[in-house]
Amino acid sequence: CRIRVAAEAEEREFYTHRASQQWLDALAPLGTNEHKPFLVSASCLIAIFLKKFSYDANGDRLKNYYTSESVGIATGLLINALHNAGVATLTHTPSPMRFLNEILERPSEERPFLLLVAGFATEKAMVPDIARLELAQIMTTIS
């Protein structure tokens, strides 16, 4: 799978040259590394792109506003829908992800946002138990 080969190349670069030791220490409990076999074994890979600008009929460039926010919200809704349908998901964001433009033949004005891995988890799948803050810790109510 060309996506796996390219993603693992970026991940190798990240783990060996880009990431600080502090970042690597934070990732250690999750057991992540440059090997991404799930990119081949998953039922589905969904490449999500955002489009920072478009062109009008005259070929003039037009800025698209709030693309990261819009795509982030839409992706969250998709993940929630998949989970409600019993499908496991994993967000994967190798950086940079421009290799997806080439492999998937997407135009340069589109920027990869996220690679969403979806499918039915294997028996060996490890889902980390990451503690979340309580709502009262992150919410302020104004009367």
PLM regions: where:
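Short hydrophobic/aromatic-enriched beta-strand-loop microsegments
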Residues: 13-15, 110-115
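Solvent-exposed alpha-helices and their adjacent loops that cap or buttress functional pockets
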Residues: 37-40, 105-108, 131-132
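Short, electropositive alpha-helical surface patch
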Residues: 99-113
